[in-house]
Amino acid sequence: MANVVVIGAQWGDEGKGKITDLLSRSADVVVRYQGGVNAGHTIVVDGRVLKLHLIPSGILYPDTTCLIGSGTVVDPKVMLGELDMLISNGIDISGLQLASTAHITMPYHRLLDLAMEKQRGERKIGTTGRGIGPTYADKSQRSGIRVLDLLDEARLRDRLEGPLSEKNQLLETIYGEKPLDPEEIIREYLAYGKRLAPHVVDCTRAIHEAASDRKNILFEGAQGTLLDLDHGTYPYVTSSNPVSGGACIGAGVGPTLIDRVIGVAKAYTTRVGEGPFPTELSGSLNDQLCDRGGEFGTTTGRRRRCGWFDGVIGRYAVQVNGLDCLAITKLDVLDEMDKIQVSVAYELDGERIDYFPSCSEDFARCKPIFETLPGWQCSTAECRRLEDLPAPAMDYLRFLADLMDVPIAIVSLGASRDQTIVVEDPIHGPKRALLSA
């Protein structure tokens, strides 16, 4: 038995969906522990492209239980849309479970999210506009609506009365928006609750029962380390904790239940929205990475900012998450490059540093110090074993493993499941990896 956390080691969009999908074959339970529909992952199965935002990738395996944990925030309309999409594709959803204590994104959360971002003007933070921040804010202020509230009309009315009155006042007087009708909301969300009811469970009890039965549990994070509310590039962050420690809080387990932590990182770096990005490229190189990598957000459709691999934030992700091994994705995107650069340190105000500054203003002044490696200029998309890779590609992977001081367990070379080199099974294999410096 092994219980594994999968996290993003960059700014999200690292390809966690594919890696989680691969690992779900060996998992009995997959738990999404934080975030909401602001995240998105794309999975290609038998030529079908499936885009999910909230439901764990493990739903594609009929014998796998998929649990949306207490640390998530749930937009029931979007979730039910995903369920309908899966059903229309012939996918069994009977294994899906939803924590009764997960918080609900309400209509006023989305309206406030968009209104506040608009009001920030040039100081915008790049929100997806899905209401995630306001939902988590209400959770912290103890005025949120939870899944269990949608199952009881009297309780929903009681919980909604105060928050909705307050939000309507904000919408009208501050943002010039029309107030929301409480009866419409109650009817709509009770209907959502009725459809979701068969999937609602006690999250902590369900996970601990699985652990007692010695089942393999996979904890799936959304977004990435540098978007973590406490450890990321604040204020250009999400409103939850994608780091591995967030799995314990969002799923309701102690740290001793976690056996291994896997970090997922692209062979280069991307970022969506605002915020500092030291290795960001411009011009034709940026366009080449964006076009070859299909770098457009699953959730927003926004074009991602692209840059070279940043070993400084990579080492930081290793430390913050306690990574045991790495999955490197999209190596094939670099196939046509004649040379590849990797940031090994920064220059900050004339001084060389090898750490991630906690102040975003300092981080914005950091200039990358690069090492240049030769490209391989041939296709890796059909490689299925390490020995199939061209020598410069192997050298590049070893360089990353040495730079981050963590071994590589998985290499992804395309969107399809079979476009993968599994150096080591992170769930059933020994606690080691074969690809290191």
From Swiss-Prot:
Substrate binds at T298, T299, T300, G301, R302, R303, R304. It comes from the Bacteria. The active site is at D13 (proton acceptor), H41 (proton donor). Its cofactor is Mg(2+). It is an enzyme of class 6 (ligase). It is found in: Cytoplasm. It catalyses: IMP + L-aspartate + GTP = N(6)-(1,2-dicarboxyethyl)-AMP + GDP + phosphate + 2 H(+). Its EC number is 6.3.4.4. The keyword Magnesium applies. Pfam families: Adenylsucc_synt. One of its GO terms (molecular function) is GTP binding. Binds 1 Mg(2+) ion per subunit. IMP binds at D13, E14, G15, K16, N38, A39, G40, H41, T128, R142, Q223, T238, R302. CDD domains: AdSS. GO terms for cellular component: cytoplasm. GTP binds at residues 12-18, 40-42, 304, 330-332, 412-414. Plays an important role in the de novo pathway of purine nucleotide biosynthesis. Catalyzes the first committed step in the biosynthesis of AMP from IMP. Homodimer. Belongs to the adenylosuccinate synthetase family. PANTHER family: ADENYLOSUCCINATE SYNTHETASE. This is Adenylosuccinate synthetase.
